[in-house]
Protein backbone atom coordinates (compact mmCIF):
# COMPACT_ATOMS: atom_id res chain seq x y z
CA UNK A 1 0.00 0.00 0.00
CA UNK A 2 1.58 3.27 -1.04
CA UNK A 3 1.55 6.43 1.06
CA UNK A 4 -1.36 8.06 -0.83
CA UNK A 5 -3.53 4.96 -0.45
CA UNK A 6 -2.85 4.60 3.27
CA UNK A 7 -3.54 8.30 3.91
CA UNK A 8 -6.74 8.08 1.90
CA UNK A 9 -7.84 4.99 3.81
CA UNK A 10 -7.24 6.74 7.14
CA UNK A 11 -9.36 9.71 6.10
CA UNK A 12 -12.30 7.44 5.24
CA UNK A 13 -12.56 6.22 8.84
CA UNK A 14 -14.05 9.48 10.10
CA UNK A 15 -17.37 9.19 11.87
CA UNK A 16 -20.52 10.82 10.50
CA UNK A 17 -22.07 13.72 12.37
CA UNK A 18 -24.04 12.67 15.42
CA UNK A 19 -27.79 12.28 14.87
CA UNK A 20 -29.85 15.23 16.05
CA UNK A 21 -31.19 14.85 19.58
CA UNK A 22 -34.45 16.50 18.64
CA UNK A 23 -37.05 15.08 16.32
CA UNK A 24 -36.73 16.03 12.68
CA UNK A 25 -39.24 16.03 9.87
CA UNK A 26 -37.51 14.82 6.72
CA UNK A 27 -38.53 14.03 3.20
CA UNK A 28 -37.86 10.45 2.12
CA UNK A 29 -34.82 11.33 0.03
CA UNK A 30 -33.26 13.29 2.90
CA UNK A 31 -33.88 10.42 5.31
CA UNK A 32 -32.33 7.98 2.84
CA UNK A 33 -29.15 10.05 2.48
CA UNK A 34 -28.77 10.66 6.22
CA UNK A 35 -29.44 7.01 7.00
CA UNK A 36 -26.77 5.92 4.53
CA UNK A 37 -24.21 8.23 6.12
CA UNK A 38 -25.08 7.08 9.65
CA UNK A 39 -24.76 3.46 8.44
CA UNK A 40 -21.23 4.11 7.19
CA UNK A 41 -21.63 4.78 3.47
CA UNK A 42 -18.37 6.39 2.37
CA UNK A 43 -18.64 6.26 -1.42
CA UNK A 44 -21.46 7.56 -3.58
CA UNK A 45 -21.55 7.54 -7.38
CA UNK A 46 -24.62 9.01 -9.01
CA UNK A 47 -26.18 10.51 -12.09
CA UNK A 48 -29.03 13.01 -11.58
CA UNK A 49 -32.51 11.77 -12.48
CA UNK A 50 -35.77 12.88 -10.91
CA UNK A 51 -37.15 12.01 -8.40
CA UNK A 52 -33.86 10.80 -6.84
CA UNK A 53 -31.81 13.96 -7.49
CA UNK A 54 -32.22 15.19 -3.89
CA UNK A 55 -30.30 12.15 -2.62
CA UNK A 56 -27.45 12.93 -4.99
CA UNK A 57 -27.45 16.61 -3.99
CA UNK A 58 -27.35 15.80 -0.28
CA UNK A 59 -24.70 13.10 -0.62
CA UNK A 60 -22.50 15.40 -2.72
CA UNK A 61 -22.26 17.90 0.12
CA UNK A 62 -22.50 15.69 3.22
CA UNK A 63 -20.40 12.60 2.41
CA UNK A 64 -17.20 14.64 2.24
CA UNK A 65 -17.81 15.89 5.80
CA UNK A 66 -17.66 12.23 6.87
CA UNK A 67 -14.44 11.55 4.99
CA UNK A 68 -16.14 9.90 2.04
CA UNK A 69 -16.04 10.41 -1.69
CA UNK A 70 -18.68 11.54 -4.18
CA UNK A 71 -18.47 11.17 -7.95
CA UNK A 72 -21.03 12.42 -10.45
CA UNK A 73 -20.92 9.79 -13.17
CA UNK A 74 -21.55 10.05 -16.90
CA UNK A 75 -24.65 7.84 -16.71
CA UNK A 76 -26.49 5.29 -14.59
CA UNK A 77 -24.46 2.39 -15.98
CA UNK A 78 -21.25 4.04 -14.78
CA UNK A 79 -22.82 4.68 -11.37
CA UNK A 80 -23.64 1.01 -10.85
CA UNK A 81 -20.20 -0.11 -12.04
CA UNK A 82 -18.46 2.45 -9.80
CA UNK A 83 -20.18 1.21 -6.64
CA UNK A 84 -19.25 -2.37 -7.55
CA UNK A 85 -15.62 -1.26 -7.77
CA UNK A 86 -15.88 0.61 -4.47
CA UNK A 87 -17.26 -2.51 -2.78
CA UNK A 88 -14.35 -4.53 -4.15
CA UNK A 89 -12.15 -1.89 -2.53
CA UNK A 90 -13.88 -2.52 0.80
CA UNK A 91 -16.00 0.63 1.01
CA UNK A 92 -19.69 0.86 1.84
CA UNK A 93 -21.09 2.35 -1.35
CA UNK A 94 -24.41 3.26 -2.92
CA UNK A 95 -26.11 5.04 -5.78
CA UNK A 96 -29.61 6.38 -6.36
CA UNK A 97 -31.78 6.38 -9.46
CA UNK A 98 -35.33 6.03 -10.73
CA UNK A 99 -37.12 3.63 -13.09
CA UNK A 100 -35.42 4.47 -16.41
CA UNK A 101 -31.98 4.65 -14.77
CA UNK A 102 -32.57 1.37 -12.95
CA UNK A 103 -33.38 -0.25 -16.28
CA UNK A 104 -30.00 0.86 -17.63
CA UNK A 105 -28.25 -0.65 -14.59
CA UNK A 106 -29.52 -4.19 -15.19
CA UNK A 107 -26.32 -5.63 -16.63
CA UNK A 108 -24.24 -4.28 -13.74
CA UNK A 109 -26.82 -5.53 -11.23
CA UNK A 110 -26.64 -8.99 -12.79
CA UNK A 111 -22.84 -8.85 -12.64
CA UNK A 112 -22.94 -7.88 -8.95
CA UNK A 113 -25.30 -10.79 -8.28
CA UNK A 114 -23.10 -13.32 -10.11
CA UNK A 115 -19.95 -12.08 -8.31
CA UNK A 116 -21.83 -11.91 -4.98
CA UNK A 117 -20.91 -8.25 -4.54
CA UNK A 118 -23.28 -6.50 -2.12
CA UNK A 119 -24.35 -3.10 -3.49
CA UNK A 120 -27.01 -0.58 -2.51
CA UNK A 121 -29.12 1.04 -5.22
CA UNK A 122 -31.91 3.36 -4.14
CA UNK A 123 -34.69 3.11 -6.73
CA UNK A 124 -36.96 6.10 -6.11
CA UNK A 125 -40.28 5.11 -7.64
CA UNK A 126 -42.37 7.53 -9.62
CA UNK A 127 -46.11 7.59 -9.08
CA UNK A 128 -46.87 6.19 -12.51
CA UNK A 129 -45.65 6.61 -16.07
CA UNK A 130 -43.73 9.74 -16.98
CA UNK A 131 -46.87 11.85 -17.29
CA UNK A 132 -47.76 11.16 -13.66
CA UNK A 133 -50.56 9.63 -11.63
CA UNK A 134 -53.46 11.35 -13.37
CA UNK A 135 -52.84 9.12 -16.39
CA UNK A 136 -52.28 5.78 -14.70
CA UNK A 137 -50.73 4.47 -11.52
CA UNK A 138 -48.80 1.23 -11.72
CA UNK A 139 -46.15 -0.95 -10.13
CA UNK A 140 -43.68 -1.32 -13.00
CA UNK A 141 -40.71 -0.19 -10.89
CA UNK A 142 -41.42 -2.94 -8.36
CA UNK A 143 -41.60 -5.57 -11.09
CA UNK A 144 -38.34 -4.29 -12.59
CA UNK A 145 -36.60 -4.42 -9.21
CA UNK A 146 -37.85 -7.93 -8.49
CA UNK A 147 -37.52 -9.57 -11.89
CA UNK A 148 -34.88 -7.43 -13.62
CA UNK A 149 -31.48 -8.49 -14.99
CA UNK A 150 -30.69 -10.31 -18.18
CA UNK A 151 -31.55 -13.85 -17.13
CA UNK A 152 -28.46 -14.33 -14.95
Predicted features and spans:
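Thiamine diphosphate
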Residues: 1-148
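Flexible glycine/proline-enriched surface loops and loop-helix/loop-strand junctions
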Residues: 151-152
